[in-house]
């Protein structure tokens, strides 16, 4: 398995690698990736779920019960549900977001894809996303999967991160650069 040492070196990477290997053995990588996408969306939408995963004062038992309930509501696969139970038992739910990102990276690498994190000041339209995807695919020489997010603090423009490469075309960065240049 060709997984970068950087991913495996982190705690989140080790858990993600283990989950990927189990999913690959069972032939359910796509299902687990879909489960993790649902879970990632739920984490973004629910402050209560964030609190359950990040609050160290919540007991392991209560975290496990809450996560099991969430898994049932979201209709997650048995492997993903068991994985989340393991995270709760080991007090690692706070690293869930990092584990999801690491799993996506590993799965994409296995498919010969690369993920581009795209941050914009406003939601991008489908045609804008498709155009960006086409240009990034041509630039990278392999299939690019976009992971768009919105950050109003950018004011305008985009910040695209692919692996360790960053393309920052945000107005915020341009204004900061101009302000620093004016300081002398």
UniProtKB/Swiss-Prot annotation:
Any one GO molecular function term: proton-transporting ATP synthase activity, rotational mechanism
Gene Ontology CC: plasma membrane; proton-transporting ATP synthase complex
Transmembrane segments: none
Organism of provenance: Erythrobacter litoralis (strain HTCC2594)
SUPFAM superfamilies documented for this protein: N-terminal domain of the delta subunit of the F1F0-ATP synthase (SSF47928)
Record key words, sorted: ATP synthesis, Cell inner membrane, Cell membrane, CF(1), Hydrogen ion transport, Ion transport, Membrane, Transport
Protein name (database record): ATP synthase subunit delta
Localization terms from the record: Cell inner membrane
Disulfide bonds: none
Oligomer and partners: F-type ATPases have 2 components, F(1) - the catalytic core - and F(0) - the membrane proton channel. F(1) has five subunits: alpha(3), beta(3), gamma(1), delta(1), epsilon(1). CF(0) has four main subunits: a(1), b(1), b'(1) and c(10-14). The alpha and beta chains form an alternating ring which encloses part of the gamma chain. F(1) is attached to F(0) by a central stalk formed by the gamma and epsilon chains, while a peripheral stalk is formed by the delta, b and b' chains.
Encoding gene per record: atpH
Pfam families linked to this entry: OSCP
Main subcellular location: membrane
Biological function: F(1)F(0) ATP synthase produces ATP from ADP in the presence of a proton or sodium gradient. F-type ATPases consist of two structural domains, F(1) containing the extramembraneous catalytic core and F(0) containing the membrane proton channel, linked together by a central stalk and a peripheral stalk. During catalysis, ATP synthesis in the catalytic domain of F(1) is coupled via a rotary mechanism of the central stalk subunits to proton translocation.
Membrane topology reported for the UniProt record: Peripheral membrane protein
Family, similarity comment: Belongs to the ATPase delta chain family.
Record's keyword annotation contains Transport: yes
InterPro entries in alphabetical order: ATP_synth_OSCP/delta_N_sf, ATPase_OSCP/dsu
């Amino acid at each position: 398995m060709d997984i970068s040492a950087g991913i495996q070196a982190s705690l989140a990477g080790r858990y993600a690698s283990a989950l990927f290997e189990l999913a690959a053995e069972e032939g359910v990588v796509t299902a687990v990736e879909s489960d993790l996408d649902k879970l990632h969306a739920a984490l973004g939408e629910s402050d209560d779920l964030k609190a359950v995963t990040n609050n160290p004062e919540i007991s392991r038992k209560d975290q496990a019960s809450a996560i099991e309930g969430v898994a049932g509501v979201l209709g997650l696969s048995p492997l993903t549900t068991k994985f989340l139970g393991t995270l709760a038992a080991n007090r690692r739910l706070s690293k869930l977001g990092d584990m999801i990102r690491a799993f996506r990276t590993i799965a994409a690498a296995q498919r010969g894809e690369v993920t581009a994190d795209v941050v914009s000041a406003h939601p991008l339209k489908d045609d804008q996303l498709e155009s960006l995807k086409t240009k990034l695919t041509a630039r990278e020489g392999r299939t690019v999967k976009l992971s768009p997010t919105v950050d109003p603090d950018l004011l305008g423009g985009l910040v695209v991160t692919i692996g360790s490469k960053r393309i920052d075309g945000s107005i915020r960065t341009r204004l900061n650069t101009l302000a620093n240049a004016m300081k002398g």
